[in-house]
């Protein structure tokens, strides 16, 4: 086991604070509308330019191990805020730095660290309740666009794109961000349910100009098995031919004689058919077939529940207004399933999302909800260079997370104003002893830090602006972009309540632990092996190689 270096008391805390300050100072230059960029060197390729707090934090690793411990703990604050709300990482870092700095001053002055932590926790719990009370629901398109704009660093086009995407696919719809091909940002909306499986034979194509299969008002046969014998399907094919409608077959696979017969029937115009493989694998495939059945009002023909393909009737088939199939995807538009059944299925999947343990499962379940509930929107980010594309894409993703958080828990006045108002409302809060009261004051002082940093990044005097804002009430604050005072909500400067709440809670959590640190232990650096170059009669020649 390697030898350890141990530091106690003030020595340990001073080192830790130095690490905290290095990381926080690098992150906080990005805060606010006039925040600056940070350039991150990469071991290969061009450097990355970012204004995203958590991206900056993740890059920082310090040489001194004690300082690095402090930096890594604040990195945890940024990461946790990012995981919970997808934004607010810089705010969380600024709050943590302020609580740690003020808290360690109090410890150095002889306060009890445990009581300080209890005071901080008490103030934060009260502040969270007040934030919830201040929160205003965010439901209309204008508010969503404003939240997106602020989070994308005052880029109005991004805010509008996100609001438009949410309008089109609903609050539950899936919105993804991809690299675009041009200079302009684009929004691509896929309505209905789309899955990544194309036609099984190009002979099904009936729109040669687009290379797609389009079926109007088709019946949809869903089978959880491989179909290779055409005899199994004859009763269904005959019934569909009599009805004079096209048929879409979604099965585990359609092969051999069955596929050949379907192709011949289609080419002769006896019955218009297209076949695709079912999406997913294993249990996920069964679940997705059931989703399609719910959406189209059909039944999955599965031997597990004793159903046989030969005995299937038109009642077992689903229906949709239109189906479009190309070589990679199938889109079912306007299934005829009952709204109540679809909502029931969505609720069931939501329950599974709550219980999911892995991010991958959660993401896949979320996609299934979106496909049932509305559709999928893709924001294609346009930029002139790859470096700009990466930076912009990160901003758009942040803005998307922020708008989701706003829809979930509502919004409060932005620009650090909400925390100032909350601090004034709980200013009379008292702890059980004087040390706890100091802890409460430390937390209240920290709640001013985001506003002060935003103002500092504008080149103005933080104390003057902070006092003016404190003198106002309600949503009165300072618009750093235009350097004007006024109603923040009217000016469209909003922060999602969830982002502000998460930033405060995670900052206080980690800062409280750091204030109560009394000892730090790390590995001693390994000393280099002695230089053996002088051995073997080469006196005085050591290190010549």
From Swiss-Prot:
ATP binds at residues 30-33, 51, 87-91, 415, 479-481, 495. Its EC number is 5.6.1.7. Its main location: cytoplasm. Keywords: ATP-binding, Chaperone, Cytoplasm, Isomerase, Nucleotide-binding. The keyword Nucleotide-binding applies. The keyword Cytoplasm applies. GO terms for molecular function: ATP binding; ATP-dependent protein folding chaperone; isomerase activity; unfolded protein binding. It catalyses: ATP + H2O + a folded polypeptide = ADP + phosphate + an unfolded polypeptide. It is an enzyme of class 5 (isomerase). CDD domains: GroEL. It is found in: Cytoplasm. InterPro entries: Chaperonin_Cpn60_CS (IPR018370), Cpn60/GroEL (IPR001844), Cpn60/GroEL/TCP-1 (IPR002423), GroEL-like_apical_dom_sf (IPR027409), GROEL-like_equatorial_sf (IPR027413), TCP-1-like_intermed_sf (IPR027410). Coiled coil: none annotated. GO terms for biological process: protein refolding. It comes from the Bacteria. GO terms for cellular component: cytoplasm. Signal peptide: none annotated. Forms a cylinder of 14 subunits composed of two heptameric rings stacked back-to-back. Interacts with the co-chaperonin GroES. HAMAP family: CH60. Together with its co-chaperonin GroES, plays an essential role in assisting protein folding. The GroEL-GroES system forms a nano-cage that allows encapsulation of the non-native substrate proteins and provides a physical environment optimized to promote and accelerate protein folding. Belongs to the chaperonin (HSP60) family. This is Chaperonin GroEL. It comes from Salmonella agona (strain SL483). The lineage of its organism: Bacteria, Pseudomonadati, Pseudomonadota, Gammaproteobacteria, Enterobacterales. The gene is groEL.
